[in-house]
Amino acid sequence: VGPGVTDLKVGDRVAYVGPLGGYAAERVFNADRAVKLPDNISYEQAAGMMLKGMTVQYLLNRTFKVGKGTIVLVHAAAGGVGLIACQWANHLGATVIGTVGSKDKADLAKKNGAHHTILYRDEDFVAKVKEITSGKLCDVVYDGIGKDTFPASLDCLRPLGYFVSFGSASGQIAAFNINLLQAKGSLFATRPTLNHYAAKREDLVSMSNDLFKVVGSGAVKIPTNHSYALKDAARSHADLEGRKTTGSVILVP
């Protein structure tokens, strides 16, 4: 611990999110990016949840305030972010619809809080959303897919709904005419990132504490379904790219 650091000491259990360089057994980084881990959060949970869980925290609580009665569409609902988002949104009282790529992933998403699932490879997800909501459509779409789900995601939104693009697993969304948002119902569209939401120390701590609270209470469980040795990092990436994983993937030194 460097000179001038007053809120951390040698032996404290800490976690962080943001600074690159995590594929290592030891590293050096600024103390203001570290947060203390509560005793009821394991290292494995922390590794599997800090980036994904903090992302879900701001998506559901700040980008769009999800609450009782909100109708939410989560793309890739069986992925690392998706499983946390489904649980947390359900906990907040929302109706959760998730798109998935297989029946096994549909079952997994439902076990983790999704009320309805859509097999996007076999079904028209826009038509299914209209059917599930009896034409009311969704208040917000959380999209980490990108190119493959746009602009169809806009057709899942009610007038004045929110399209939240937080990732681009299938590629970047192409440039589009902003008037499309007006034509689809005076929609809002945003491309948020965790770095901006957690840029201030007080926000980082507040967001972390919110995450620790829902995980510590059991309201949200962190599915670390895939653990790899640090030396096998390349294989973990290949499995991710091959869509062979669900939930969080962690590397163990």
Model-inferred region functions:
Residues 1-19:
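A glycine-/small-residue-rich N-terminal strand-loop-strand element
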Residues 100-103, 148-219, 253:
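Glycine-rich phosphate-binding loop and adjacent beta-alpha segment
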Residues 13-76:
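NAD(P)H dinucleotide-binding glycine-rich loop of Rossmann-like/cofactor-binding domains
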Residues 76-77, 145:
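NAD(P)H cofactor-binding loop motif with strongest signal on the N-terminal glycine-rich segment
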Residues 90-152, 200-202:
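Adenosine-nucleotide cofactor-binding segment
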Residues 201-253:
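C-terminal hydrophobic helical "lid"/dimerization subdomain
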Residues 81:
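Hydrophobic/small residue at the entry helix of a nucleotide-binding pocket
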